[in-house]
Amino acid sequence: MVTINDLSFNPDYSSISVSTSDGFKIFNCEPFGEFYSSQESPLRKSISNSLEDSAGCQNPTHSKTDSQDTPARFPTAFLKMLFSTSLTIVVPQTQDNLGNRLLKIYNLKQNLKICELNFPSSIIDIKLNRKRLLVVLDTGQLYIYDLSCVRLLKILQLSFNEHDGDQKFIGDLSADDSSWLIIPVQSTNNQTDLLNAETGSQPSTPKLTPSDSVINTGSYSQYLEFTRNSSLSNLKKKNKLITLEDIKNDSEGWVVVYDTINLAPVVIFEAHHSTIARICISHRDNKVATASIKGTIIRIFDLKEFEGKVKVHKVKNLRRGHNLVKVNSLSFHNDNHILGCGSESNTIHLFKIHEEESDICTNENSEDRTNHNSDYEDSDGDTSKSSEDLNENLANLLISKPLDPVPMETEDKLSSSWFVKTKKLINNQYTSSIIKKLPYKDYFENLIWEPPQRSFAYIKLPEYAPHNEKDPRSNKVEIGFNNDLVFIASYHTGNFYQYQIPKQRGPVSSINEDDKREECSLISQFNLI
């Protein structure tokens, strides 16, 4: 039985690769079609021809006496593509206890191996763009390479929490040349060195030594950005230096944006109160999407530079649902107008995220707007609905008064201006003092500032994959986009789906959104195996 090890879109979603226990294949997404395979074919030149036997790599399971109709097996753990170029990263899958420690860089067009790297432990993830190659090991090391010359620049020492038997890397690398790496602060430890920008003389083939990491004692105060969600953080009261350990103790939901070009932190902000489960960065404009382990709220942080410093310009909150669920996929559309979210519920949600003109902030009032961004508290599952009802009643007690009956034609106008009036009312000092004493003050503030935004479209896959503790990726999907199409690749079946995105009729209102959500239409279905 063929096992899917990895599914991966290239950064512009034009191609998708599948790595299996038999080999790998690369497909064009639209129009769909296979254009490369590791298995021998008389119609296609294969990279298999240039794979030579090496230590740590399983030998091909065929001989010269084999029939030409019998495909060769080259088990592959990972395959990553650099946009639509011929440069490809391949990690062969091994059957021994040493793990997948060998990485090879190929030029597929010329069927030529450029170089290979051996690592001290097994590779669990790979990130790359035109400037940088990141290799993540199961022992917590993150290797940062200059891709242009495959030169090792830095090794970050991290800590990974094994969740549901799946040891994975939580983080993302921007596709543009800024090369920002976003990781949870909880993934750092006392040996994580984010402040030392010296590259030193690093060997092309890494060897793990105690000097690869430096004890972290530096101050990160200048990189902290406090949003409305973190306005009550104890870190604001500290006058002395703030270490990564201080940030970790404050909350589990802080994330750090790290510049892999200049090897220095960019900004650190609190995304959630709970542990971060998923991070995704947009293809442009520096938008960061995060999900916590609760999986009820997705947050999008718009990062912009003001006076030489990167700040959180705006926060958008997206309500995935009320039930606790594991979010396993987040993907931005190429134009940044849509965010796709997949979870173990087997439903994919599509959120409209582009800003209306009234939402755009100028440099003059950006700081004020940042302090007043809404930030919904993570849902607590079964009690979320009752909390909403309670806080809605509290809102009515504070901001409502008996009104005379109004004609039907004026009702819509009053409804549309309700949130504008309440935003002004919340600035009242007396009202603010009352809110601080409420048992559900966090949720109440969010209710006043901005109603929760739900998805405008969704996808129910024709397959059902129940959660399997032995295989955490059994119900995981990868999401890609191309204009008005959304691509879904399933780990469970190896199927590749193309769906039509419903046309958006104006801005998605936060009121009665359940009536406006539409199901995407299935256009075509293929198999990647």
From Swiss-Prot:
Q: Where is the composition biased (Basic and acidic residues)?
A: 366-375
Q: Where, subcellularly, is it found?
A: Cytoplasm; Membrane; Vacuole membrane
Query: Where does the record place its WD repeats?
Result: 271-311, 321-361
Q: Which GO terms describe its molecular function?
A: phosphatidylinositol-3,5-bisphosphate binding; phosphatidylinositol-3-phosphate binding; protein-macromolecule adaptor activity
Write down the superkingdom of origin: Eukaryota
Which keywords describe this protein according to UniProt? Autophagy, Cytoplasm, Membrane, Protein transport, Repeat, Transport, Vacuole, WD repeat
The short motif L/FRRG motif is annotated over: 318-322
One GO cellular component, as annotated: phagophore assembly site membrane
Regions of biased composition (Polar residues) lie at 49-62
Q: Which Pfam families match?
A: PROPPIN
Topology versus the membrane: Peripheral membrane protein
Keyword Repeat (UniProt):
yes
**UniProt-listed GO biological process terms:** autophagy of mitochondrion; glycophagy; nucleophagy; pexophagy; protein localization to phagophore assembly site; protein transport
Answer whether the UniProt record assigns the keyword Cytoplasm to this protein. yes
User: Quick one: where's region Disordered?
Assistant: 49-70, 362-388
Role this protein plays:
Required for cytoplasm to vacuole transport (Cvt) vesicles formation and mitophagy. Involved in binding of phosphatidylethanolamine to ATG8 and in recruitment of ATG8 and ATG5 to the pre-autophagosomal structure. Protects ATG8 from ARG4-mediated cleavage.
Protein family (similarity comment): Belongs to the WD repeat PROPPIN family.
- What's written under domain? Contains a beta-propeller domain involved in specific binding to phosphatidylinositol 3,5-bisphosphate (PIP2). The L/FRRG motif is essential for the cytoplasm to vacuole transport (Cvt) pathway and for the recruitment of ATG8 and ATG16 to the PAS in nutrient-rich medium and in both its recruitment to and dissociation from the PAS under starvation conditions.
Identification of the protein by name = Autophagy-related protein 21
Instruction: Give the originating organism.
Output: Candida albicans (strain SC5314 / ATCC MYA-2876) (Yeast)
> Lineage from the top down?
Eukaryota, Fungi, Dikarya, Ascomycota, Saccharomycotina
Gene name, Swiss-Prot/TrEMBL: ATG21
